[in-house]
Amino acid sequence: MAPQNPLLGTWRVESFERWTADGTLTQPLGMPPAGYAVFDDTGHAFVQLGRATTTDLSPKDIAQSLMAYFGPYAIDGDELTVTVEASNMAAYIGSHQVRRFARDGDALTLGVEGQYRAKLRRVTA
């Protein structure tokens, strides 16, 4: 029997935090951000997040406030790797995006220590 996939399902982004070079914790997408991460049973991930409210932003800033990518994923222990097939961020295309993750029931934390952290909650209905 194959081990259960701890990420399988749809997850709503509840917060997205980034550390600046001086160690200050910021919320670059505001609170709350908007977005989802979907991990399907065929091994594909779809991630999209951005600002929930963009009415005060210029069209350029709106485009820069959105992060989206997809591709096949693999799990090794508490490490998630997404091989990015396409993204609105050119540097991600063809890259391996590696994140540590932790599950606590329907709560999921993904991130890179000292760089950023996203907190998500499983969508159940």
Spans of model-derived segments:
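Lipid interaction determinants
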Residues: M1-A125
